[in-house]
């Protein structure tokens, strides 16, 4: 009987804490054929509904427009990783930055804190417009 109670407690505490999952993404950003330097990229766990998204990692593109970020989160259900890109390519003097999101496929979710399978977003030309693109002043 004590063993059953202990197993129930362990199982319920696991459900409350969740399990550690990770994701990572790399890519290259260009603006009109030139490296997009210093562009802010953020990796989130997309929490749908009223719960705020969980920031997993953030960084900026280097002098070649390259970036690579990864992070982890404890969740009971599978994480829903997404990459937000904030930029000013072809933006003129408009306030705030252009923002768009790339959803990371579930096949790139890793168990544990170590990312073994990183999503390669490829080369992204920022000069065009993207589905769901908006503006963000407070990122």
From Swiss-Prot:
Residues 1-15 form the signal peptide. It is found in: Secreted. Gene3D superfamilies: 2.60.40.3330. GO terms for cellular component: cell surface; extracellular region. Keywords: Secreted, Signal. Its main location: secreted. InterPro entries: Transthyretin-like, Transthyretin-like_sf. Pfam families: TTR-52. The keyword Aminoacyl-tRNA synthetase does not apply. Belongs to the nematode transthyretin-like family. This is Transthyretin-like protein 5. It comes from Caenorhabditis elegans.
């Amino acid at each position: 009987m004590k063993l059953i109670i202990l197993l129930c407690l362990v199982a319920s505490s696991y459900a409350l804490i969740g399990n550690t999952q990770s994701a990572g993404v790399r890519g290259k950003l260009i603006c009109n054929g030139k490296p997009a330097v210093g562009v802010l990229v953020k990796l989130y766990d997309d929490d749908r509904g009223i719960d705020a998204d969980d920031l997993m990692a953030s960084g900026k593109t280097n002098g070649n427009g390259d970036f690579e970020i990864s992070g982890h989160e404890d969740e009971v259900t599978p994480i829903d990783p997404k990459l937000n890109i904030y930029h000013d390519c072809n933006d003129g003097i408009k306030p705030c930055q252009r923002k768009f999101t790339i959803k990371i496929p579930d096949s790139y979710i890793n168990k544990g804190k170590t990312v073994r399978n990183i999503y390669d977003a490829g080369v992204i030309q920022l000069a065009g417009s993207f589905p769901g693109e908006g503006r963000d002043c407070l990122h």
